[in-house]
């Protein structure tokens, strides 16, 4: 599918007369949105935070689950937030307000 993504981006950029970066960005957002909906439906979780990154040279893409690091006593949305103490177990420099990502 990697090659198809590159062909799609090239065709859309030429057809709409926009830069490939704009098309890549829109495609990343669309894939992230579809992933959020699918996971939320399949797991009955609140909406999660997801980021998709497409390699501009190969067309390969990665999906990352994301959580915002919050104070331990301010952990209201477990599907989108991670408590500072939990984040610190995985990362030495966990700081409130930063984003923790997992592929």
Task: Identify the residue ranges that each predicted region occupies.
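Charged, low-complexity terminal tails
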Residues: 1-103
């Amino acid at each position: 599918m990697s090659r198809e993504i590159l062909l799609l981006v090239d065709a859309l950029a030429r057809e709409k007369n926009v830069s490939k970066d704009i098309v890549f960005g829109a495609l990343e957002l669309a894939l992230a949105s579809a992933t959020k909906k699918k996971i939320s439906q399949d797991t009955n979780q609140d909406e999660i935070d997801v980021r998709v990154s497409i390699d501009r040279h190969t067309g390969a893409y990665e999906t990352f689950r994301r959580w915002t690091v919050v104070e331990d006593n301010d952990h209201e949305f477990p599907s989108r937030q991670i408590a500072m103490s939990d984040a610190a177990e995985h990362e030495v420099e966990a700081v409130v307000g930063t984003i923790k990502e997992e592929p």
